[in-house]
Amino acid sequence: MAVKEYTGLSEIRGPIVVVENVSGVRYDEVVELILENGEKRTGRVIIAGENVAIIQVFEGTEEMDIEGTRVRFLGKPLEVSLSPDLLGRTLDGLGKPRDNLGEIVPEKTVDINGSPINPSAREYPRNFIQTGISSIDVLMTLIRGQKLPIFAGNGLPYNRLAVQIARQAKVTTEEEFAVVFAAIGLRKDDANFIVRSLEESGAIKNMVVVLNLASDSVAERIATPRVALTIAEYLAFDLGMHVLVILNDMTNYCEALRELSNYRGEVPGRKGYPGYLYSDLASIYERAGIIKGRSGSITQIPILTMPNDDITHPIPDLTGYITEGQIVMSRSLFGKGIYPPIDILSSLSRLMKDGIGEGYTREDHPDVASQLFSAYSRVMEVRSIASIVGEEDLPEIDKLYLKFGEEFEHLFINQSFDEERSIEQSLDLAWKILSILPETELTRINREYIKKYYKASDET
């Protein structure tokens, strides 16, 4: 399609500009805006009318003059350059190098919006991805092709958890594995911590970091997760790699979506978010999966901060409808000094049942996970009773459950930022803690596994 150029804008509204008396303009078309001083900025068409185009400008509209700005419609959608050389690189939210290591010679360029996976071509997710974190690997196992979000509150260490997962994640087979880390609207100190941690550990060699700072434009923020997923699709379905995509923080993405919606003058929905928030999030989350006949996979961990710790807020609420489980971070565990402070009873992985056990992790894994959930639930009940009657008046079995709860939180859930545990180490640790309880309490575990792994402690 031919390039069309116009001079002058009709209106500037925040990161939005309006151009009138145009023709043949398409929705999602890339636009080049040339300021009077020769500076070039990039935008895309978000509304294409009969003779008007509304454009969101990725670099912002500061110092842009209404009369002197030239607008070029390039006749193509926003694309990202793809190459195996992307591994080890840090890019901006539009997929351009940010690490001063030179330009990337593209093998191909692809529209960042991708295309949805045909449901009939999807393969059911199986096989697990080891994160090296006991509570996740044993109790809410991440499965290849799954989308498993992390719900956190402000002030909780979700950035540390994201970095630890990115650094330690691996597949237990000999297949190739990579991580795409999209930092969306993060403060500079958080972004520096993430990049520095990944570089110092050497993990960045098998990663692509797509970095959008809080100081970058909200328009670029909308593109960031799509750029990251387009890169992931190339690594997975062209190069045959298993790819884990970490999207941190999707709340910042949704705030940017709300801001742009307000600039457009759209009718707001719940809490001011646009009515299409659900379908917009689905267009991102549903790019995870496995395609029949292809060797790669895309697994997603979207991370989002819940305003006021409200899990019913539209962002976590709608995310929960689209994804396959959730990992919830606990403020009370964080207050006890436990890291990662994962709320076990509020978290689950809906696909773990099909990717654990014999042939995947270890034969006792499903039973151990079920027993840990059951026992920890009993711990919560006993703690409630103890807060009323006191621990001294509890029966001996309840005192054992209290001891189990303390050991479970401080030895199993709690692990240091630099500690990586294999699935075997995590399961062995689970058995050690379960052995605090009498054998008769392990009602959810096959007798064969009890004989093999159970070792009664002195308390029992």
Curated annotation (Swiss-Prot):
State the disulfide connectivity: none
Species source reads Thermotoga neapolitana (strain ATCC 49049 / DSM 4359 / NBRC 107923 / NS-E)
The Swiss-Prot or TrEMBL record describes its family as follows: Belongs to the ATPase alpha/beta chains family.
Keyword Ion transport assigned to the entry: answer is: yes
**CDD domains, A to Z:** ATP-synt_V_A-type_beta_C, ATP-synt_V_A-type_beta_N, V_A-ATPase_B
Which positions make up the signal peptide?
none
Kindly list any coiled-coil regions of this protein. none
Which superkingdom does the taxonomy of this entry point to? Bacteria
Any Pfam family hit: ATP-synt_VA_C
Identify this protein by name. Answer: V-type ATP synthase beta chain
According to its UniProt entry, what is the function of this protein? Produces ATP from ADP in the presence of a proton gradient across the membrane. The V-type beta chain is a regulatory subunit.
Q: PANTHER family given for it?
A: V-TYPE PROTON ATPASE SUBUNIT B (PTHR43389:SF4)
Q: Which NCBIfam families match?
A: PRK04196.1
Keywords of the record = ATP synthesis, Hydrogen ion transport, Ion transport, Transport
